[in-house]
């Protein structure tokens, strides 16, 4: 027997009465007030929960972002799938060691249309499926893009320097795009990884990584050398870059704190900051 829930029941408490109702139109208006302009290239990191009670959820956020940049603009979001990695490196949660060979053999290959994001949030997962969106081909660190420069943004994303040379991050840099942190801190700012590739800061290290490269309906495991990422100082670095960057803006979009800034200036300043202040030979947690 199927039981139906009566949505008219009067004993149900209204959802989140202490929060404002946030709509697509309001989000688009708030984005414009923050400084998002039609025709621009915008790399977005967004937290849906930080925005408040959004009518339409992640879909409304994606539509509002599209409204803000317009048809001549370009939106970009990271759509990482970190679970397409060697199971021996999994920590949250780990899996039994006797599972590793089976997982390596049976792992589905990356499919830009089918493979879901992992840990990227509802907005990024919704955005990658938007009409007209395209996704780069890196099995672990793909980006989705929509709009006038979408194809250019994702075209050169190879296996080496996954967030460096040829990556969508570098394409946003070339296009002099902006970054929008929407309810996120600088620890979510993937553009700082581009700076890590460009800077020979003290203590920079590399390691060997295994990447599952699609081969038909299976994967072939390829071992590559890559730099070790370090995000523990991203918030400090970001705040420092803000003090030296004219033209950035802080505000509120929905109920979320938001920061908008030029990516190119931030990456260049981050390179300088790492050279002067970062030493992974001494850093705790490196």
UniProtKB/Swiss-Prot annotation:
Pathways involved: Antibiotic biosynthesis
Q: What is the effect of changing residue 45 to A?
A: Retains 1.5% of activity with CMP-5'-3APn as substrate
Instruction: Check the record and name the InterPro entries matching this protein.
Output: Amioglycoside_AcTrfase, Antibiotic_NAT-like
Q: Which reaction does it catalyse?
A: CMP-5'-(N-hydroxy-3-aminopropyl)phosphonate + acetyl-CoA = CMP-5'-(N-acetyl-N-hydroxy-3-aminopropyl)phosphonate + CoA
Ranges that cross the membrane: none
Superkingdom in the source lineage? Bacteria
What biological-process GO terms show up in the record? antibiotic biosynthetic process; response to antibiotic
Q: Where is the signal peptide?
A: none
Binding, acetyl-CoA: 45-49, 54, 122, 188, 190
Please give the annotated consequence of changing residue 190 to S. No change in activity with CMP-5'-3APn as substrate
Q: What is its EC number?
A: 2.3.1.-
Q: What is the effect of changing residue 188 to A?
A: Modest decrease in activity with CMP-5'-3APn as substrate
Alphabetical keyword list? Acyltransferase, Antibiotic biosynthesis, Transferase
According to the UniProt record, what happens if one changes residue 231 to A? No change in activity with CMP-5'-3APn as substrate
Q: What is the effect of changing residue 193 to A?
A: Retains less that 1% of activity with CMP-5'-3APn as substrate
- Gene Ontology MF terms: aminoglycoside 3-N-acetyltransferase activity
User: In the UniProt record, does the keyword Signal occur?
Assistant: no
What binding partners and quaternary form does the record give?
Homodimer. The four molecules in the crystallographic asymmetric unit pack as two pairs of dimers.
Its family remark reads: Belongs to the antibiotic N-acetyltransferase family.
Q: What is known of its domains?
A: The acetyltransferase fold is distinct from that of members of the canonical GNAT superfamily.
Write out the function statement from the record. Answer: Acetyltransferase involved in the biosynthesis of the phosphonate antibiotic FR-900098, a potent antimalarial agent that acts as an inhibitor of 1-deoxy-D-xylulose 5-phosphate reductoisomerase (DXR), the first enzyme in the nonmevalonate pathway for isoprenoid biosynthesis. Catalyzes the N-acetylation of CMP-5'-(N-hydroxy-3-aminopropyl)phosphonate (CMP-5'-H3APn), leading to the formation of CMP-5'-(N-acetyl-N-hydroxy-3-aminopropyl)phosphonate (CMP-5'-FR-900098).
- Provide the protein name: CMP-5'-(N-hydroxy-3-aminopropyl)phosphonate acetyltransferase
Species of provenance: Streptomyces rubellomurinus (strain ATCC 31215)
Q: Which gene encodes it?
A: frbF
